[in-house]
Amino acid sequence: MDAPSSASGPTQPRLSPADALAALRASAPLTQCITNYVAMQIAANTLLAAGAAPAMIHTVEESGAFAGLARAVTINIGTLSPAWVDGMKAAIDGATAVGTPWVLDPVAHYASAYRSAVARDLLSRRPTILRGNASEILALAGGNTAARGVDAADPVTAAGAAASALAREYGSVVAVTGAVDLVTDGTRVAMVSGGSPWMPQVTALGCSLTCLMGAFAAVTAPLEATVAALTLFAEAGARAHAHSEGPGSFAWRFLDALAAVTPDDLTGTERVSWNAP
């Protein structure tokens, strides 16, 4: 089901997942990914399989200038150091200066005081899209969570109100990812279903999803970009699962499936429901 009418950014059209995938593959948007050590290779391969062009540029000496050239920027705090944080801030400043969309993934921001402070600082810079699991989004909005590491300890539906509050406060589209994903801009809500139960057993798939959201934000408005990325992930995950025996075979079949999914496969998909809690 296509998205209902919604406000979009000044330059990006509102596209269905099918049209967004076609636009992404037609333009191969250059996407700057400042992600963690664990995720770099799989994130780059994910973007290549989907049809985008990754660039893993993170040093402060060049990240800001490169962000001015990229069509989207993604920030993931999975493996932090002061030097990397400086590079993140420079990239955000570079993207903001030219109106380039950027995505924030506050991985396990509740795990330490330093990590929490960095996440809060980056969030205050008003990301175009904010992606996290339910525990990350709940904690970022000031709620309680039992999570301590990178994995969620709360169901997606428990973070719905927190996601809406964050979206309204920061003007961001917020995605809460899990077995069923929730996306909101503070007013509209979409749920995306599909994927595979093996996805949480393959490291860095969520981090790669953050990068893919950035790539889609280069070709369509933020809400639609987020839904398109989730829909493509869900479709590819379901296809890979059908031919896999476990998380090992799923990991490489998932990349094949990403490359094989066509815009027609996402046309009229029933994976997306709008304004569903």
Swiss-Prot record:
Keywords: ATP-binding, Kinase, Magnesium, Metal-binding, Nucleotide-binding, Thiamine biosynthesis, Transferase. CDD domains: THZ_kinase. Substrate binds at residues 56, 204. Its EC number is 2.7.1.50. GO terms for molecular function: ATP binding; hydroxyethylthiazole kinase activity; magnesium ion binding. One of its GO terms (biological process) is thiamine diphosphate biosynthetic process. It is an enzyme of class 2 (transferase). The keyword Nucleotide-binding applies. Its cofactor is Mg(2+). Pathway: Cofactor biosynthesis; thiamine diphosphate biosynthesis; 4-methyl-5-(2-phosphoethyl)-thiazole from 5-(2-hydroxyethyl)-4-methylthiazole: step 1/1. It comes from the Bacteria. It catalyses: 5-(2-hydroxyethyl)-4-methylthiazole + ATP = 4-methyl-5-(2-phosphooxyethyl)-thiazole + ADP + H(+). Catalyzes the phosphorylation of the hydroxyl group of 4-methyl-5-beta-hydroxyethylthiazole (THZ). Belongs to the Thz kinase family. This is Hydroxyethylthiazole kinase. The gene is thiM.
